[in-house]
From Swiss-Prot:
It is found in: Cytoplasm. SUPFAM superfamilies: GroEL apical domain-like (SSF52029), GroEL equatorial domain-like (SSF48592), GroEL-intermediate domain like (SSF54849). This is Chaperonin GroEL. Belongs to the chaperonin (HSP60) family. GO terms for cellular component: cytoplasm.
Length: 552
């Protein structure tokens, strides 16, 4: 076991605070409409440019191990805020730095760290309740666009795209962000159910100009196994040929003789057929086949339930108004399923989401809900260079998560104003600690709540104290604040400067939680650096060569 290096008391806390300040100072330059970018070096390729707090934090490692522990704990604040609400990472970092700095000053002055933490926790609990009172629902498309605009660094086009996407596919729909091939941003909405499986043979293509297959009013055969023998499908193919309707086969796989026969019959014009692999793997594939069955009023042919493909009838086939198949994706539009069955299926999946433990499972279940109910929207992000593209894509993804948070818990006035209002209300309330040290903890938290506004103002090149005091005057309007972009005072909601309540709440709670742990730290332990032993390369003479000098 490696030997350890230990630091205690103020020595430990000073080192930790130094690490906190290094990371926070790098992150907080990005805050607000006039925040700056940070350039991150990469081990290969071009550096990346970002204005996203958590991206900056994740990239920082310090050489001094004690300082690095402080930086890593602060990094956790940004990561937790990002995981919870998708935004507010820089705000959380600024709040945590302020709480740690003021808290450690109080500890150095002789206050009890545990009581300080209890005071901070009391102030934060009260602040969360006040934020809920200040919050307003966000259902209007205009407000959703404003939240997206603010989160995307005042990019109005991005805010509008996100608002349009949410309107088209509902709040539960899947919205993804992809890189565009050109310079322009755009929105593509896929109606119906789409899954990422394309045609098994290009010979099925019937639209040469788009290299795709398009069927109107097709039958849909769903099979939970590989199909390799064409004889298993003869009865179904006869029914389809007689009716003159196209057939889409969705199975685990279609291979060998079965695929070859389908291709030949399609090319001869005997039947219109296309085959694709079922989406997903394992149990997830079975569930997704059931989703398609419910959507199309079909039945999954599965040996597990005693079904046989040979005995399948027309009653087992699903139907849809239209199907479009490309080499990468299959889209089923306007399935013939009953609305009540689809809704029941959606409710069932929602219950699974509530019980799911992993983020991956939740995401996949959410996608299934969206495909059954809302559809899928793709926001295409364009930029002139790859570096700009990556930076913009990250901003749009943040903005998308922020708008979802706004719809979930509502909005509060942005620009750091909500926390200023909350702090003022708590300061004027009857909130008190059990002792004077707890009261100091409450004051530490309330002072920290001013720090986001102050940092936004500093980044805009203005005097923080003057503007903070003017905003505190309130003028009888809780929404009264300072617009750093236009350098004007006014109603933040009317000016379109909104923050999702969830983002502000999460930033404050995670900042206070981690900062409280740092304040109560008394000892830090790390591995001692290993000393590299220089290999013994000095010549001590070679055995048996003692008389070499005399050879000359």
């Amino acid at each position: 076991m490696a030997a350890k290096d230990l630091k205690f008391g103020n020595d430990a806390r000073k080192k930790m605070l130094k690490g906190v300040n290094i990371l926070a100072n790098a992150v907080k330059v990005t805050l607000g409409p006039k925040g700056r970018n940070v350039v991150l070096d990469k081990s290969y390729g071009a550096p990346s440019i970002t204005k996203d707090g958590v991206s900056v934090a994740r990239d920082i490692e310090l050489e001094d191990k004690f300082e690095n522990m402080g930086a890593q704990m602060l990094k956790e604040v940004a990561s937790k805020a990002n995981d919870a609400a998708g935004d507010g990472t820089t705000t959380a970092t600024v709040l945590a730095q302020s709480i740690v700095t003021e808290g450690l000053k109080a500890v150095a002055a002789g206050m009890n760290p545990m009581d300080l933490k209890r005071g901070i926790d009391k102030a934060v609990d009260a602040a969360v309740e006040e934020l809920k009172k200040l919050s307003k629902p966000c259902k209007d498309s205009k407000e959703i666009a404003q939240v997206g605009t603010i989160s995307a660094n005042a990019d109005e086009k991005v805010g509008t795209l996100i608002s349009d996407a949410m309107k088209r596919v509902t709040n539960e729909g899947v919205i993804t962000v992809e890189e565009a091939s050109g310079l322009e941003d755009g929105l593509i909405v896929v109606e119906g159910m789409q899954f990422d499986r394309g045609y098994l043979s290009p010979y099925f293509i019937n639209k040469q100009e788009s290299s795709s297959i398009e069927f109107d009013n097709p039958y849909i055969l769903l099979v939970d196994k590989k199909i390799s023998n064409i004889r298993d499908m003869l009865s179904i193919l006869e029914v389809v040929a007689k009716e003159g309707k196209p057939l889409l086969i969705i199975a685990e796989d279609v291979e060998g003789e079965a695929l070859a026969t389908l291709v030949v019959n399609t090319m001869r014009g005997i039947v219109k057929v296309a085959a694709v692999k079922a989406p997903g793997f394992g149990d997830r594939r079975k569930e997704m086949l059931q989703d398609i069955a419910v959507l199309t009023h079909g039945h999954v042919i599965s040996e597990e339930t005693g079904d046989s493909l040979e005995k399948a009838t027309q009653e087992n086939l699903g139907k849809a108004k239209r199907v479009v198949i490309t080499k990468d994706a299959t889209t089923i539009i306007d399935g013939a399923g009953e609305k009540s069955r689809i809704e029941a299926r959606v409710q069932n999946i929602r219950k699974q989401i509530e019980n799911a433990t992993s983020d991956y499972d939740k995401e996949k279940l959410q996608e299934r809900v969206a495909k059954l109910s809302g559809g899928v929207a793709v926001i295409k992000v364009g930029a002139p260079t790859e570096i700009a593209m990556k930076e913009k894509k990250a901003r749009v993804e943040d903005a998308l998560q922020a708008t979802r948070a706004a719809v979930e818990e509502g909005v509060v006035p942005g620009g750091g104003v909500a926390l200023i209002r909350v702090a003022s209300k708590i300061a004027n309330s009857s909130l008190k600690g059990d002792n004077e040290d707890q009261n100091v903890g409450i004051r530490v938290a309330l002072r920290a709540m001013e720090s986001p506004l102050r940092q936004i103002v500093v980044n805009a090149g203005e005097e923080a104290s003057v503007i903070a005091n003017k905003v505190k005057e309130n003028k009888g309007n809780d929404n009264y604040g300072y617009n750093a972009q236009t350098e004007a005072y006014g109603d933040m909601i009317e000016m379109g400067i909104l923050d999702p309540t969830k983002v502000t709440r999460s930033a404050l709670q995670y900042a206070a939680s981690i900062a409280g742990l740092m304040i109560t730290t008394e000892c830090m332990v790390t591995d001692l650096p290993k000393e590299e032993k220089a290999s013994d390369m000095g010549s001590g003479g070679m055995g048996g060569m003692g008389g070499m000098n005399g050879m000359m």
